[in-house]
A protein has these predicted regions:
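Metal-dependent phosphoester-hydrolase catalytic domains
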Residues: 2-11, 17-155
Length: 155
């Protein structure tokens, strides 16, 4: 945060291991085992209050049409039992993010998910149709998380 105060571009990305409040909304409370909950997840709320933008939600603001699920990803080369965390639940969520602090001359131009199209759903490998832009890997995908790729233009 000191870098931002010093006039530097700040881009923060990674596996946050926590969903976003922008995904657990009134519109999604009855989806993916959210159990009717609207949750103000701490990390995303804190980042938003500090002025950071969620790249995926900036391009795709609707979590119903573009959930952007990143975990658990179906890695065909990994035994299913190593990928399943909650075999009776739909625990798919978007927990991998790229956030950025607005900066003069910096424009977000595109964002996509990188990884396999399939997910782990209720202990099974599933591939559902999605409107999310997914760039599939050419080779073996090594993790149970999909990645996020954001493209920026800097003047």
């Amino acid at each position: 945060f000191r870098s931002r105060e010093a006039g530097r571009i700040v881009i923060l990305g990674g596996d946050f291991n926590e969903p976003s409040h922008l995904d657990w909304t009134e519109a999604t409370k009855d989806m993916r085992d959210h159990q009717g909950l609207v949750v103000p997840w701490h990390v995303s709320v804190m980042l938003e209050k500090d002025g950071f933008k969620d790249t995926y939600r900036e391009i795709f603001p609707n979590p119903v049409t573009h959930p952007g699920l990143t975990c658990p990803a179906d890695c065909k080369d990994i035994a299913l039992e190593k990928l399943v965390w909650s075999p009776k639940a739909d625990d798919r969520d978007r927990i991998d993010f790229i956030h950025y602090a607005p900066f003069e001359g910096l424009t977000l131009t595109d964002v996509c998910i990188i990884g396999p199209k399939g997910d782990i759903l209720r202990g099974q490998r599933e591939t559902e149709e999605t409107s999310d832009p997914i760039m599939t890997p050419l080779g073996i995908w090594p993790t149970d998380h999909k990645a996020v790729l954001a493209t920026f233009h800097l003047k």
